[in-house]
Protein backbone atom coordinates (compact mmCIF):
# COMPACT_ATOMS: atom_id res chain seq x y z
CA UNK A 1 0.00 0.00 0.00
CA UNK A 2 1.68 3.19 -1.19
CA UNK A 3 1.54 6.62 0.45
CA UNK A 4 -1.32 7.67 -1.84
CA UNK A 5 -3.45 4.76 -0.63
CA UNK A 6 -2.60 5.60 2.98
CA UNK A 7 -3.58 9.23 2.43
CA UNK A 8 -6.78 8.13 0.69
CA UNK A 9 -7.64 5.85 3.62
CA UNK A 10 -7.13 8.73 6.04
CA UNK A 11 -9.34 11.09 4.02
CA UNK A 12 -12.01 8.45 3.48
CA UNK A 13 -11.96 7.44 7.15
CA UNK A 14 -12.23 11.06 8.29
CA UNK A 15 -15.04 11.75 5.83
CA UNK A 16 -16.98 8.76 7.13
CA UNK A 17 -16.58 9.92 10.72
CA UNK A 18 -14.04 7.27 11.70
CA UNK A 19 -10.79 9.15 12.33
CA UNK A 20 -9.55 6.64 14.90
CA UNK A 21 -10.02 3.73 12.49
CA UNK A 22 -8.23 5.60 9.71
CA UNK A 23 -5.36 6.48 12.05
CA UNK A 24 -4.95 2.90 13.29
CA UNK A 25 -5.05 1.53 9.75
CA UNK A 26 -2.51 4.08 8.59
CA UNK A 27 0.02 3.48 11.36
CA UNK A 28 -0.14 -0.29 10.87
CA UNK A 29 0.30 -0.01 7.11
CA UNK A 30 3.11 2.54 7.29
CA UNK A 31 4.92 0.46 9.93
CA UNK A 32 4.72 -2.68 7.77
CA UNK A 33 6.00 -0.77 4.72
CA UNK A 34 8.92 0.72 6.66
CA UNK A 35 9.88 -2.70 8.11
CA UNK A 36 9.79 -4.33 4.66
CA UNK A 37 11.75 -1.49 3.08
CA UNK A 38 14.39 -1.55 5.84
CA UNK A 39 15.52 -5.10 5.00
CA UNK A 40 18.22 -5.06 2.32
CA UNK A 41 18.45 -8.34 0.41
CA UNK A 42 21.46 -9.84 -1.35
CA UNK A 43 21.26 -9.65 -5.14
CA UNK A 44 22.36 -13.28 -5.56
CA UNK A 45 20.74 -15.13 -2.63
CA UNK A 46 17.85 -12.91 -1.60
CA UNK A 47 19.05 -13.30 2.01
CA UNK A 48 19.25 -10.28 4.32
CA UNK A 49 22.33 -8.04 4.30
CA UNK A 50 24.27 -7.72 6.42
CA UNK A 51 24.20 -11.23 7.91
CA UNK A 52 26.63 -13.38 9.85
CA UNK A 53 28.19 -16.65 8.70
CA UNK A 54 31.32 -18.59 9.63
CA UNK A 55 34.48 -19.60 7.78
CA UNK A 56 34.19 -23.15 6.43
CA UNK A 57 37.82 -23.50 5.41
CA UNK A 58 40.91 -23.62 7.59
CA UNK A 59 42.65 -21.32 5.10
CA UNK A 60 41.00 -18.72 2.86
CA UNK A 61 42.33 -15.83 0.79
CA UNK A 62 40.55 -12.56 1.54
CA UNK A 63 40.75 -10.69 -1.77
CA UNK A 64 40.51 -7.06 -2.75
CA UNK A 65 37.76 -7.79 -5.30
CA UNK A 66 35.28 -10.53 -6.31
CA UNK A 67 37.54 -12.71 -8.50
CA UNK A 68 40.69 -14.83 -8.19
CA UNK A 69 42.48 -12.23 -10.33
CA UNK A 70 42.26 -9.73 -7.46
CA UNK A 71 45.11 -9.32 -5.01
CA UNK A 72 45.05 -11.27 -1.72
CA UNK A 73 45.09 -8.79 1.18
CA UNK A 74 44.70 -11.26 4.06
CA UNK A 75 44.82 -15.01 4.63
CA UNK A 76 42.19 -16.21 7.12
CA UNK A 77 43.29 -19.30 9.05
CA UNK A 78 40.68 -19.83 11.78
CA UNK A 79 38.04 -22.33 10.73
CA UNK A 80 34.70 -21.32 12.25
CA UNK A 81 35.57 -17.63 12.68
CA UNK A 82 32.48 -15.43 12.44
CA UNK A 83 32.25 -13.12 9.43
CA UNK A 84 29.65 -10.57 8.41
CA UNK A 85 28.51 -10.64 4.77
CA UNK A 86 27.98 -7.06 3.58
CA UNK A 87 27.57 -7.57 -0.20
CA UNK A 88 27.17 -10.23 -2.88
CA UNK A 89 28.54 -10.37 -6.42
CA UNK A 90 27.99 -13.60 -8.36
CA UNK A 91 29.56 -16.41 -6.32
CA UNK A 92 31.56 -13.95 -4.19
CA UNK A 93 30.71 -12.40 -0.83
CA UNK A 94 32.21 -9.25 0.64
CA UNK A 95 32.85 -9.95 4.32
CA UNK A 96 34.01 -8.09 7.40
CA UNK A 97 35.83 -9.70 10.32
CA UNK A 98 35.80 -8.84 14.02
CA UNK A 99 38.70 -6.40 13.51
CA UNK A 100 36.83 -4.53 10.77
CA UNK A 101 38.97 -5.83 7.90
CA UNK A 102 36.98 -6.34 4.70
CA UNK A 103 37.49 -8.32 1.53
CA UNK A 104 35.94 -10.83 -0.83
CA UNK A 105 35.63 -14.61 -0.36
CA UNK A 106 34.17 -17.26 -2.66
CA UNK A 107 30.85 -18.47 -1.23
CA UNK A 108 32.13 -22.07 -0.98
CA UNK A 109 34.52 -20.96 1.80
CA UNK A 110 31.59 -19.92 4.01
CA UNK A 111 28.88 -21.78 5.88
CA UNK A 112 25.67 -20.68 7.55
CA UNK A 113 26.62 -22.05 10.98
CA UNK A 114 26.63 -19.22 13.50
CA UNK A 115 29.64 -18.65 15.71
CA UNK A 116 30.75 -15.86 18.01
CA UNK A 117 34.18 -14.53 18.92
CA UNK A 118 34.75 -13.37 22.49
CA UNK A 119 35.69 -9.67 22.47
CA UNK A 120 35.79 -9.14 26.24
CA UNK A 121 39.06 -9.83 28.08
CA UNK A 122 37.32 -12.66 29.97
CA UNK A 123 33.74 -13.77 29.38
CA UNK A 124 31.58 -15.50 31.99
CA UNK A 125 29.11 -17.93 30.43
CA UNK A 126 26.03 -18.07 32.66
CA UNK A 127 23.29 -20.62 33.36
CA UNK A 128 20.60 -18.10 32.32
CA UNK A 129 20.42 -14.83 30.39
CA UNK A 130 21.02 -12.70 33.47
CA UNK A 131 24.01 -11.07 35.20
CA UNK A 132 22.77 -12.72 38.41
CA UNK A 133 22.85 -16.27 36.98
CA UNK A 134 25.48 -18.80 38.03
CA UNK A 135 28.70 -18.86 35.97
CA UNK A 136 28.99 -22.19 34.13
CA UNK A 137 32.22 -21.55 32.18
CA UNK A 138 34.70 -18.83 31.26
CA UNK A 139 36.22 -17.93 27.89
CA UNK A 140 39.09 -15.61 27.00
CA UNK A 141 39.29 -12.96 24.29
CA UNK A 142 39.52 -14.49 20.81
CA UNK A 143 37.84 -17.81 21.66
CA UNK A 144 35.31 -18.88 19.01
CA UNK A 145 32.15 -20.64 20.20
CA UNK A 146 29.07 -21.90 18.35
CA UNK A 147 25.91 -19.82 18.85
CA UNK A 148 22.89 -21.90 19.84
CA UNK A 149 20.32 -19.11 20.12
CA UNK A 150 20.04 -15.37 20.73
CA UNK A 151 17.46 -13.23 22.51
CA UNK A 152 17.38 -9.44 22.82
CA UNK A 153 20.66 -8.82 24.70
CA UNK A 154 22.04 -12.34 25.20
CA UNK A 155 23.22 -15.35 23.19
CA UNK A 156 23.57 -18.96 24.33
CA UNK A 157 27.04 -20.11 23.27
CA UNK A 158 29.00 -23.34 23.34
CA UNK A 159 28.02 -26.97 23.36
CA UNK A 160 27.39 -29.60 25.99
CA UNK A 161 28.84 -28.88 29.42
CA UNK A 162 30.66 -25.74 28.24
CA UNK A 163 27.51 -23.94 27.14
CA UNK A 164 26.09 -20.82 28.70
CA UNK A 165 24.60 -17.39 28.14
CA UNK A 166 26.73 -14.36 27.26
CA UNK A 167 25.79 -10.70 26.78
CA UNK A 168 25.90 -9.67 23.11
CA UNK A 169 28.07 -6.70 24.06
CA UNK A 170 30.92 -9.13 24.96
CA UNK A 171 30.93 -11.08 21.66
CA UNK A 172 31.17 -10.48 17.90
CA UNK A 173 29.01 -12.52 15.54
CA UNK A 174 25.41 -11.53 16.35
CA UNK A 175 23.70 -8.22 15.61
CA UNK A 176 22.15 -6.27 18.48
CA UNK A 177 18.62 -6.64 17.05
CA UNK A 178 18.88 -10.33 16.15
CA UNK A 179 16.82 -13.04 17.81
CA UNK A 180 16.87 -16.64 16.65
Where do the language-model regions lie?
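SH3-family beta-barrel domains
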Residues: 22-64, 75-79, 86-89, 96-101, ...
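Intrinsically disordered, low-complexity polar regions and short flexible loop motifs
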Residues: 67
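Beta-strand-rich domains and repeat architectures in extracellular enzymes and scaffolds
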Residues: 70-72
